[in-house]
Amino acid sequence: GDVYKRQIMNCMKGACCTLLSLLFSLTVSSGCKEKDMSMKMNEPHNIKGVISYKRSFGDLNDTHLSVAKKIGIRPLASRSEAEGLGGKLVQIKPCERYAMDSLTHSIPFLIPQASALLDTIGANFLDSLSCKGLNPNQIIVTSVLRTADDVKRLRRRNGNASANSAHAFGTTFDVSYRRFCKVEDPDGRPMQDVSPDTLKLVLAEVLRDLRKSDKCYIKYELKQGCFHITAR
């Protein structure tokens, strides 16, 4: 009788183990749905842009200069001077909100107000792309604070480079409208590209709204392929 009881107990234990392992595997498989690795397509909607870039972003150099002189730092002779300005300047670095060119004729410093404006533009642009069904892209900062040394070097390459520029006051930065930085999916899911023309339309909407709410002055730079932006 005892042998028979032991056999039944062993059978029941085995059945329980099988049932438990089956339940475990079902739970795990339902919790770990395979990630969709098909290409993430754009589903664009509600992209309007602005009627005219020149008219929408026509703030002239004098307007930029006037506010830059009021709220900015005094122009610097060299890069080493920027390091010593402590709380007056914020060093900007590529982050989740924006990408940066390797700056050859400027240095990555802005007054806190302009740094905050750049953060807002980058964040609003990403939000706007998401709302309009477009895959994420970052804006690219192409020029920031220029010292007297930077202007001298820039003039050798571009005779029109003005020594009298808002870039000298730490209030002003340029953002490309021709190039953007595609944000790749962290898990490697392929993402459909968004054309630079479409991205330019969305960026123009973001900038128009910030300009209308008196956050900045903006000049559309046709030759340089950028928006020239000064904090207010």
Show which residues each predicted segment covers:
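Short, small-residue-biased leader/transition segments that mark boundaries at the very start
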Residues: G1-Y4
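Bacterial N-terminal signal peptides
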Residues: T18-T27
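Extracytoplasmic cell-surface/polysaccharide-interacting catalytic and binding patches
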Residues: K33-S130, L222
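Second-shell loop/turn segments in exported
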Residues: M100-P112, I139-V141, D185-D197, T230-A231
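Stable alpha-helical elements in mature extracytoplasmic
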Residues: L110-L117, I121, N135, D150, ...
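Acidic helix-start/capping segments at beta-turn-to-alpha-helix junctions
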Residues: L134-V151
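Charged, often glycine-rich, active-site loop that binds/positions anionic groups
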Residues: A148-A163
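Catalytic cores and adjacent binding grooves of peptidoglycan-active enzymes
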Residues: N164-R232
